[in-house]
Amino acid sequence: MTASFSNFKRHLIAISVACCLTLISFSQNIVVAPYLQNGSPTNMTVMWETDVANDGYVDWGMTAATLTNTVTSASISGEGNNRIHTALITGLNDDTKYFYKVRTFTGIVSATYFFKTHPTKTSEKSLNIVAMSDMQRDGSNPNVFETIINSGIIPVANANYPNGMEDIEAILIPGDLVATGTYSSWRDTYFTPSVGITPYVPTYPVPGNHEYYGTGISLFLDYSDLPLNGSPSNPEEWWYKDISNLRIVGLNSNSPNADL
């Protein structure tokens, strides 16, 4: 083997490795599955998290086979290079079922989910709402939250409502979604166990004292998109939401020093 050919092989290997590293650096994964926030008769908010800073998209439509409408997300910084995405779907019909999926700039695509817009106030439609709290992980019973969803809420809805989870209008969580306000606590102990329901039903949480542990409530606010109709000095901490003829009021009852 000549010296020049040996050098050529080394350069070729180096180029191949560099190309592989470039491809790896631009790969993108969905690390928090899509979940719904802040719905209305005409809008729905979809949020999710990726591990690289690239554009995100929501494709949506009236059927799972016709996701022909697209919304581009806005995003904020998460842990490391992660981005927390928020996409607002507008121009919807009230009390109507839609389908959606999210995808990344690099072509990673989520499963296809559905949601239903809220009924109007004047419809005075009766509602089914799930209210639960204090699902922060207990080390001695770490799977309780997941069990409540997969062995409680979902089968009860499927057995008692004509359209299953589609007939649940909202999930209310008055605090203590997580044990500590860290990224791993949010991803591993709240979002992962709740993936059976949060992509389909909008969630309306308020912070408990556990959300303050470690980071204040910064991650609670980063992972939430709540009505901006409360106190201007504390947006998304006090709010109200009208669903049919029901008004839901969310109140943060914690002091700024709740991390005690």
PLM feature spans:
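Bacterial N-terminal signal peptides
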Residues: 13-24
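Divalent metal-dependent phosphoesterase catalytic cores across multiple superfamilies
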Residues: 28-207, 211-237, 242, 258-260
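Serine/threonine-rich, low-complexity intrinsically disordered segments
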Residues: 4, 24-26
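N-terminal secretory signal peptides that target proteins for export/translocation
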Residues: 1-9
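Residue-level detector of intrinsically disordered/flexible regions characterized by low predicted structural confidence
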Residues: 9-11, 103
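Residues within helix-turn-helix
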Residues: 254
